[in-house]
A protein has these predicted regions:
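Short coil/turn segments at alpha/beta junctions that flank glycine-rich nucleotide-binding fingerprints
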Residues: 54-55, 109, 130, 171
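Generic hydrophobic, amphipathic alpha-helix propensity
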Residues: 40-49, 65, 90-98, 102, ...
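Conserved hydrophobic residue
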Residues: 57-58, 174, 202
Length: 220
């Protein structure tokens, strides 16, 4: 049995190659994280809104959103770590927009019923101008991925409306039922009003649809 002769250069060659690799990478910066380029977040949200309302939230992968937004998936995940975070951010941004539109119509000097009507009409006017956003809010009504932090933020945006509903109950304008009941009914009725106006199937004018829809809210 003979002992295989060790090439004296083999070990040294590996060491020299390793040393060269270290020299070549020394001081080299790691791959940069995706940059927060102005406008990328908005592009992602706008694209998500368009795709969610066309194909549905569950049927729209984040890869398609990033592709159609013209950004990398790394950039999308830089802003939104997962799809639920993206859905929640879009939902909250639209809810804030709604709150601003509705609150803009409010005037503390008006009687409670007039304030109520102005707020609802403000939402309907906003909804007629933003049908895709209304469709997305409808999709999210029972979406399980909306986090509690987003729900709390939305509640804070509309807490004044809960107070207005409470005043309407106290004054006998609406039936003496829980605020949550009336908030849900307002949402359902206004969604129905917007759907009927968009469909044009009733033969009624938008004002007639709105007037008859609002009449369903008041105490008989």
């Amino acid at each position: 049995m003979t002992t295989k002769r060790r090439d004296p250069d083999r070990g040294g060659g590996r060491k020299r190659n390793a040393a060269a690799a270290i020299r070549n990478t020394a001081g080299r910066q790691p791959a940069p994280a995706p940059k927060s380029t102005p406008g990328n977040r908005e592009k992602i949200l706008d694209t998500a809104l368009r795709l969610f309302t066309r194909y549905g939230v569950d049927a729209t992968p984040t890869s398609r959103i990033s592709r159609e937004a013209g950004v990398s998936t790394g950039t999308l995940f830089h802003y939104f770590p997962d799809k639920d975070t993206l859905v929640g951010a879009l939902y909250l941004s639209i809810k804030k927009e709604v709150a601003g539109a509705v609150r803009h119509q409010d005037a503390l000097s008006l009687p409670t019923k007039e304030r109520f009507v102005h707020g609802i009409r403000g939402y309907i006017a906003w909804g007629m101008a933003n049908p895709l956003k209304v469709r997305f809010l409808d999709q999210c009504y029972n979406y399980p991925g909306i986090g509690e932090d987003v729900q709390r933020a939305v509640y804070d945006e509309f807490s004044w409306m809960a107070g207005l509903i409470g005043a309407a109950i106290d004054e006998g304008i609406v039936p003496d039922l829980p605020v949550e009941f009336h908030a849900t009914m307002v949402y359902k009725i206004t969604s129905g009003i917007l759907a009927l106006i968009e469909s044009g199937s009733t033969g009624l004018s938008p004002d007639e649809i709105i007037g008859n829809g609002l009449a369903m809210l008041w105490k008989k």
